[in-house]
């Protein structure tokens, strides 16, 4: 209720455009009077689920035979079929792009959340960098990162956070018994989660050990330069695809075999 109230205060006049509807769950929340016996508890004969609430809202608003927007990009097939069976006369329209746009525009408190998460992640990576040397195991690096993040008391390390070296550095894998050698590249792909605030970070970097092949140092420099170019080019209004190409095409000029799904 507090979060809803704060959100409405931020929205101001636009707050009337959304309504929060409660529904039943298996969690039996009771008032103090009910617990002490001062008030009578009336048990429901049946639970009203979120889908029950949805059906009621659609029918009360006379929408069961009209056009309904759904987020098809993330809706699972059984749930969508349930919608079709419940509202056979409705026309379902994919509005996934509208949700993407809504999520891409961050409020000030969300921006601050990401800044805090990134700072905590960076501190964790820094602590790991202090111990990266030949003889250190993958699991030791992972433990160092996790301990640093948990010590903040603000968030938790992502369960998929990985630190790998040698042959394992070329694939996505959980930390195992790999030991850093002076010719290795040490890779990390890790992040932190804000738990029930549902925000997360995802960062990947690599450390090149001192006796690694010279070409690996040149590749590392090119990747770093591409990243710096991308950061320098970032500005409001610039399409993300253009920002991506700034780094991607710079690296690909020198390394035609380069492939990357995202740069961040």
Language model regions located:
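Active-site neighborhoods and metal-handling regions in enzymes and metal-associated proteins
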Residues: 1-264
């Amino acid at each position: 209720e507090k979060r809803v109230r704060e959100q409405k205060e931020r929205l101001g006049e636009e707050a009337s455009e959304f309504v929060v509807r409660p529904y039943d769950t298996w969690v039996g929340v009771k008032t103090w009077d009910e617990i002490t016996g001062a008030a009578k508890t009336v048990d429901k004969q049946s639970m009203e689920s979120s889908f029950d609430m949805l059906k009621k809202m659609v029918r009360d608003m006379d929408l069961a035979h009209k056009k309904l927007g759904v987020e098809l990009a993330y809706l699972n097939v059984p749930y969508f079929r349930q919608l079709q069976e419940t509202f056979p006369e409705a026309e379902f329209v994919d509005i996934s792009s509208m949700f993407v746009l809504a999520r891409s525009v961050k409020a000030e408190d969300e921006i601050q959340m990401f800044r805090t998460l990134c700072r905590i992640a960076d501190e964790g990576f820094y602590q790991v960098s202090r111990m990266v040397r030949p003889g250190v195991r993958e699991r030791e690096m992972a433990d160092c990162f996790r301990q640093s993040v948990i010590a903040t008391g603000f968030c938790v390390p992502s369960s998929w956070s990985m630190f790998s070296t040698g042959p394992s550095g070329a694939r996505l894998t959980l930390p195992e018994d790999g030991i850093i050698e002076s010719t290795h590249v040490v890779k990390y792909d890790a992040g932190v989660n804000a738990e029930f605030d549902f925000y997360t970070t995802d960062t990947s970097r690599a450390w090149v050990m001192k006796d690694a092949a010279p070409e690996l140092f040149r590749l590392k420099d090119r990747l770093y330069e591409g990243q710096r170019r991308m950061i320098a080019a970032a500005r409001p209004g610039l399409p993300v695809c253009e920002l991506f190409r700034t780094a991607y095409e710079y690296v690909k000029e020198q390394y035609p075999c380069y492939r990357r799904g995202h740069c961040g």
